[in-house]
């Protein structure tokens, strides 16, 4: 990406966890983003749920059981997570399709794992933009761009 050289909007297709934990659905969403939406990039999410959630949060029931993929909120989140090898497969598929791969990282472990894939950029969700340990690690170790969302952040927190 080039900065301050505006020619057209840079479109990022937010896939998030809409793949329902199925890598083939994820690949189909990449294809749709590229072919039908002409997106420049796709973005997934990566969480280490045991690191991100408290034990109580992990073990509580999903707030909407009809939409749950597991007995607890933690198991639901685990079902939706791709491991690092699956993320590498998705990145390779993106390269094959001619679209940029990226991921939002929600914790330090996920930041370390995803940065090992050397994506062009990593996004920090607004819910995690005060995770100082993760931000310092990324600034010191990750060579790509870091995009920080501030949607859930007050001016004083920024």
Language-model features and meaning:
Residues 14, 33, 114, 149:
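Conserved, mostly hydrophobic/aromatic
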Residues 11-13, 40-44, 101-103, 120-124, ...:
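Hydrophobic faces of well-ordered beta-strands that scaffold small-molecule active sites
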Residues 22-23, 83-87, 110, 124-143, ...:
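Active-site-adjacent beta->alpha loops and helix N-cap segments on the catalytic face
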Residues 28-47, 117-118:
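Catalytic domains of carbohydrate-active enzymes, especially glycoside hydrolases
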Residues 16-18, 45-49, 106-108, 127, ...:
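Active-site beta-loop-alpha junctions enriched in small/polar residues
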Residues 38, 113-122, 139-146:
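Glycine-enriched alpha-helix->loop->beta-strand junction motifs that scaffold or abut catalytic
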Residues 1-13:
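N-terminal amphipathic alpha-helix/helix-capping segment at the start of soluble metabolic enzymes
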Residues 21, 40-81, 110:
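Glycine-rich, proline-tolerant flexible connector loops at the mouths of alpha/beta enzymes
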């Amino acid at each position: 990406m080039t900065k301050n050289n505006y020619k057209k909007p840079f479109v990022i297709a937010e896939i998030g966890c809409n793949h329902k934990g199925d890598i083939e659905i994820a690949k189909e969403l990449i294809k749709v983003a590229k072919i039908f939406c002409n997106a420049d990039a796709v973005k997934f999410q990566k969480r280490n749920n045991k690191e991100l959630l408290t034990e109580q949060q992990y073990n509580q029931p999903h707030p909407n059981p009809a939409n749950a993929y597991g007995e607890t909120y933690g198991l639901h989140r685990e079902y939706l997570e791709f491991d690092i090898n699956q993320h590498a497969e998705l990145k390779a598929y993106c390269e094959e399709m001619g679209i940029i791969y990226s991921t939002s990282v929600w914790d330090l472990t996920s930041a370390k794992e995803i940065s090992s894939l050397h994506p062009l950029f990593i996004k920090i969700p607004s819910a995690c933009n005060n995770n100082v340990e993760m931000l310092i690690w990324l600034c010191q170790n990750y060579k790509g761009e870091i995009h920080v969302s501030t949607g859930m952040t007050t001016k004083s927190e920024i």
